[in-house]
């Protein structure tokens, strides 16, 4: 090869290499620009249009680092949309209940700073469960805990912690309240908080950490609400509120709330005579509540709420094994589905039940007269057959020698079904235990199971003689 040919060959090779390098630089530039703009866009599968990421509520923020030669590009993966809960899955089939959580608040109060509380409940967002209670504005080992048997003071606040975490000094005080309800609509928490004078109280509606709406007492006689979770379906949350006498006719209303704003109020209708402290659960497409009749019945009233047209129906649990306390013994008690049974109806305790086809699962104190012990069972035909009394799958949660208190339901959505869980308030201190001057509680929590289970008793467990006075 002569010198001219060598020069031509070397030049051709150099030109080829230069062309390849030029094309690679163009490819890198195009990729860089594309990824840079991609981090601000999401592809919407519904209509193939591009929409910005910023206004979308997100569950998590994931950043990937992509390396191209000497260039570092941060690419944000657009998160999935957070949607309202609709609770459309079926109810889980269960054989009974298994232990889930216990906070041991009273035992821990013997040596630590734990809030004095009552009226606890549990509610869950889509990822985690929380326990709530109405605090008395004091810890137990504190002279302010004297005489905390009283229900309504301006110092009471709604407390919120992860389930299983006792209410320590770092606990968040969500709002001022001596009566409350809370629920998560899939996007944010709604808290209904009642406080003020007995004859002119205020209910505040707090959504996503902001006060959105309020309503004043309509009967000027202790406006009050559920003391357990409310329920939200497709962005509409329902809460049952009562104002009026605790031992005669009262004025109950069902409030419909969207993102903290009251959008409709329906009066109670149907055959229920007195409704307080409802334990509510989603029963798609509506909401169902089992409540406390503090006037005429030891059988529990049912309130059915239609979220779409705001209509209300009410009746009573059919089971002749009734759920309130005090009550007649099981041989003598009765219920015929429509009306209160007029059996030891005056006074009562918050409780729960839920339908399982024609049957009913329910919990109640073991004692017929006092808030002692706690049991659960299923009554065959108890939802549809008047005065049905065939009991199966009985479990003791708290033995009859130990104190219980309020109880209520909460629902947990699984992959294929909705599970029902319940909590039991374990009251300690006054009035029964007069060695001390305070009244407070711990809780125990069980959830439905399709498996097998054993036996036991899960009382509060604190030795009152070791407790601060």
Swiss-Prot record:
Catalytic residues, per the record, are 151 (proton donor/acceptor), 406 (nucleophile)
The residues the record assigns to binding substrate are 118, 152, 276-277, 292, 371
Family the UniProt entry places it in:
Belongs to the glycosyl hydrolase 34 family.
- Note how its activity is modulated: Inhibited by the neuraminidase inhibitors zanamivir (Relenza) and oseltamivir (Tamiflu). These drugs interfere with the release of progeny virus from infected cells and are effective against all influenza strains. Resistance to neuraminidase inhibitors is quite rare.
User: Encoded by which gene?
Assistant: NA
Q: What does this protein do?
A: Catalyzes the removal of terminal sialic acid residues from viral and cellular glycoconjugates. Cleaves off the terminal sialic acids on the glycosylated HA during virus budding to facilitate virus release. Additionally helps virus spread through the circulation by further removing sialic acids from the cell surface. These cleavages prevent self-aggregation and ensure the efficient spread of the progeny virus from cell to cell. Otherwise, infection would be limited to one round of replication.
Q: Where are the transmembrane segments?
A: 10-30
Q: Which reaction does it catalyse?
A: Hydrolysis of alpha-(2->3)-, alpha-(2->6)-, alpha-(2->8)- glycosidic linkages of terminal sialic acid residues in oligosaccharides, glycoproteins, glycolipids, colominic acid and synthetic substrates
Q: Which residues lie on this side of the membrane: Virion surface?
A: 31-469
Query: So where does Ca(2+) get bound?
Result: 293, 297, 324
List required co-factors.
Ca(2+)
What are the EC numbers?
Answer: 3.2.1.18
Q: Which residues are glycosylated?
A: 61, 70, 86, 146, 200, 234, 402
Entry membrane topology = Single-pass type II membrane protein
Q: What is this protein called?
A: Neuraminidase
Q: Name one GO biological process term.
A: carbohydrate metabolic process
Q: What is the lineage of its organism?
A: Viruses, Riboviria, Orthornavirae, Negarnaviricota, Polyploviricotina
Q: Which Gene3D superfamilies match?
A: 2.120.10.10
Task: Identify the stretch(es) annotated as Involved in apical transport and lipid raft association.
Answer: 11-33
Which EC class heads this enzyme's classification? hydrolase
| Cellular compartment(s) | Virion membrane; Host apical cell membrane
Which organism does this record belong to?
Influenza A virus (strain A/Texas/1/1977 H3N2)
* Record text on subunit structure and interactions: Homotetramer.
